[in-house]
C-alpha cells in the first residue's frame, strides 16, 4: 500500500515510523510519503486566507492543495479529507481502506477549507463528534487502524479478527499469568481446556459487554441462532438481578 499525506506538520507523524506501521514499512508492505503543502503555496507561502462574505477564522486556500496533489504520482487513489463534518470513522471503514492500493490523506489546520478542495476528494471522514486543532491526529489514528489490517502486517493473521468491533461486538475479557493475582483469579472455564465451553463463555461475555457498554451496536448486529439464545439469557439474568 502507498499512502501520501498532505500536512503542514510532517514532523507530527514521527510516531508512525514505529510499532505496527513501522514494521509494515520494514516488510515492504507499506510506503508513506509526507507532503508539506506550504512548499507549494504561491502567495508568499501563505496557505490560508479570509473567507469571502466575511466570517470567523481563516480558510485553507485551494491552490496549495491542488498543486500538491498535482505533484503526487498516483493512479486511482482514495483521497480522504479529514473534516469534523464528515462521515464517522468505523472499523468497517478501516477494513475497506485496507483493501486499497493508494490512499491520500488531506489534513487541514484552520477554520475550514475552500469548498473547491472537495472536488479532489473521494471521502470526507470525521474521527468523531469533536473538533481537533488539525487533521494530523485523526489521520494517524485512521492510518494505524487501517495498516494493521493489511495481510501479513500482524504476526498472526487472525489476531485482528477478534478485536473489538471486527466482529460487530466488543471483545471478551482476556487473562494471562499468574492465575491468582491479589485474590483476583482467572475464570475456571479458561483453565478447563474444554474448547467448546471456552468458546461459549467468550461469546456470552462479548455479548454481555456489548449490551452493557455499547447497546447501539446490537441494533444492527446480525445474530446467529446460538447468539440470540445466549443474548436472551443474558437479558433475562440482568433483568432478574434488577428486581
UniProtKB/Swiss-Prot annotation:
Amino acids binding S-adenosyl-L-methionine: 108, 127-132
Pfam families: tRNA_m1G_MT (PF01746)
Gene Ontology CC: one annotated term: cytosol
GO MF annotations in UniProt: tRNA (guanine(37)-N1)-methyltransferase activity
GO BP annotations, alphabetical order: tRNA N1-guanine methylation
UniProt xrefs under Gene3D superfamilies: 3.40.1280.10, tRNA(m1g37)methyltransferase, domain 2
S-adenosyl-L-methionine keyword on record: yes
Entry function: Specifically methylates guanosine-37 in various tRNAs.
Summary of subunit composition and partner proteins: Homodimer.
Protein name: tRNA (guanine-N(1)-)-methyltransferase
UniProt source species: Streptococcus equi subsp. zooepidemicus (strain MGCS10565)
Lineage of origin: Bacteria, Bacillati, Bacillota, Bacilli, Lactobacillales
Gene from which the chain derives: trmD
Amino acid at each position: 500500500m502507498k499512502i501520501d499525506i498532505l500536512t503542514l506538520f510532517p514532523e507530527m507523524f514521527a510516531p508512525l515510523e514505529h510499532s505496527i506501521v513501522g514494521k509494515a514499512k520494514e516488510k515492504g508492505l507499506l510506503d508513506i510519503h509526507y507532503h508539506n503543502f506550504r512548499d507549494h503555496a504561491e502567495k508568499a507561502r501563505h496557505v490560508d486566507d479570509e473567507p469571502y462574505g466575511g466570517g470567523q477564522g481563516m480558510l485553507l486556500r485551494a491552490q496549495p492543495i491542488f498543486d500538491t496533489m498535482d505533484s503526487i504520482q498516483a493512479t486511482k487513489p482514495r483521497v480522504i479529507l479529514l473534516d469534523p463534518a464528515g462521515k464517522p470513522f468505523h472499523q468497517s471503514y478501516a477494513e475497506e481502506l485496507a483493501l486499497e492500493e493508494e490512499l491520500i490523506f488531506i489534513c487541514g489546520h484552520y477554520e475550514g477549507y475552500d469548498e473547491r478542495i472537495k472536488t479532489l476528494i473521494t471521502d470526507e471522514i470525521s474521527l468523531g463528534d469533536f473538533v481537533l486543532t488539525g487533521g494530523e491526529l485523526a489521520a494517524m489514528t485512521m492510518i494505524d487502524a487501517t495498516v494493521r489490517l493489511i495481510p501479513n502486517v500482524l504476526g498472526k493473521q487472525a489476531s485482528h479478527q477478534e478485536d473489538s468491533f471486527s466482529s460487530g461486538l466488543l471483545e471478551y475479557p482476556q487473562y494471562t499469568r499468574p492465575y491468582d493475582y491479589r485474590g483476583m483469579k482467572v475464570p475456571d472455564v479458561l483453565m478447563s481446556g474444554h474448547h467448546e465451553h471456552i468458546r461459549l463463555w467468550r461469546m456470552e461475555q462479548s455479548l454481555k459487554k456489548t449490551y452493557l457498554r455499547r447497546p447501539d451496536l446490537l441494533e444492527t448486529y446480525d445474530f446467529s441462532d446460538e447468539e440470540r439464545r445466549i443474548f436472551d439469557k443474558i437479558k433475562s439474568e440482568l433483568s432478574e438481578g434488577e428486581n
